[in-house]
């Protein structure tokens, strides 16, 4: 594909006409959830300004879902995604939302290191951590699964071969070179022998579906294609206590 074709193949916002309205709804629901009892906001895990965690606890000794937000490593923030905690919390699973420095202020190597630093911090409080994330957060999930504190992973609508990212509009801010792309592409790295679910929407862009299916095959993970969901609506299946992704999470925690 040439640059124009690649740009279109990975432009999730343009592919979903009401994506802006969906994100606005996420933000409203997240604001409401952040007022709940048991919320500890902006816990600092590292030296950078965005090295902060929002923690939603059930008050019980239970597994933790550590969720990494998306935005092609260069936009969005953890606060927008608090709404996804609703489903796990209903089942007694604690939830952490991880923030990190965005490109171009940070290179991808540094972003990966920050997220692993967040897991260092969380491992002091939790013995069972399922790492999860959406879009760029799905990529960071795969890159973090090797962390000793991670017991399992739930990667949602992620990117696992970053060569297309290097060649399309995403790289205008991400600034990947070929070497950095290769060492941060999970599909080219040794498989981590831990339980992993690779989820994607069957109404997503074909390239996103391809990346998920090929990565799941490569690492012998469970591929979970969700009918009727695009790149944005798929997160409703984690926000809902009865959602498919919530059920997948329960399976990863043995519940």
Predicted regions and their residues:
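The feature captures the conserved acid-bearing segment of alpha/beta-hydrolase catalytic domains
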Residues: 152-161, 165-170, 176-217
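Short beta-to-alpha linker loops that shape the active-site pocket of alpha/beta-hydrolase fold enzymes
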Residues: 71, 94, 99-103, 159, ...
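Catalytic nucleophile-loop/oxyanion-hole region of alpha/beta-hydrolase
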Residues: 76-85, 96-128
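Primarily recognizes the serine-hydrolase "nucleophile elbow" in alpha/beta-hydrolase
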Residues: 117-173, 181
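C-terminal catalytic histidine-bearing segment of alpha/beta-hydrolase fold enzymes
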Residues: 209, 213-216, 220-255
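N-terminal cap/lid segment of alpha/beta-hydrolase-fold proteins
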Residues: 9-60
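Short beta-strand element of the alpha/beta-hydrolase
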Residues: 62-71
């Amino acid at each position: 594909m040439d640059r124009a074709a690649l740009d279109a193949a990975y432009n999730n916002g343009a592919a979903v006409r009401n994506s802006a309205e969906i994100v606005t709804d996420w933000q409203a629901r997240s604001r409401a959830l952040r007022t709940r009892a048991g919320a500890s906001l902006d816990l600092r895990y590292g030296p950078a300004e965005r090295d902060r965690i929002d923690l939603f606890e059930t008050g019980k000794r239970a597994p933790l879902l550590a969720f990494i937000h998306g935005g092609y490593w260069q936009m969005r923030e953890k606060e927008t995604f608090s709404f996804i905690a609703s489903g796990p919390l209903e089942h007694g699973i604690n939830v952490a939302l991880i923030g990190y420095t965005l490109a171009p202020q940070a290179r991808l190597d540094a972003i990966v290191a920050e997220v692993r630093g967040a897991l260092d911090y969380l491992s002091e409080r939790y013995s069972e951590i399922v790492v999860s994330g959406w879009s760029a957060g799905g990529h960071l999930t795969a890159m973090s699964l090797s962390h000793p504190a991670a017991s399992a992973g739930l990667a949602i609508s992620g990117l696992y071969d970053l060569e297309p990212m290097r060649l399309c509009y995403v790289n205008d801010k991400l600034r990947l070179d070929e070497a950095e792309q290769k060492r941060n592409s999970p599909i080219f790295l040794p498989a981590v022998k831990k339980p992993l679910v690779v989820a994607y929407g069957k109404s997503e862009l074909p390239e996103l579906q391809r990346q998920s299916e090929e990565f799941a095959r490569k690492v012998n993970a469970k591929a979970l294609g969700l009918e009727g969901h695009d790149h944005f609506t798929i997160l409703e299946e984690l926000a809902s206590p009865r959602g498919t992704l919530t059920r997948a999470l329960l399976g990863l925690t043995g519940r």
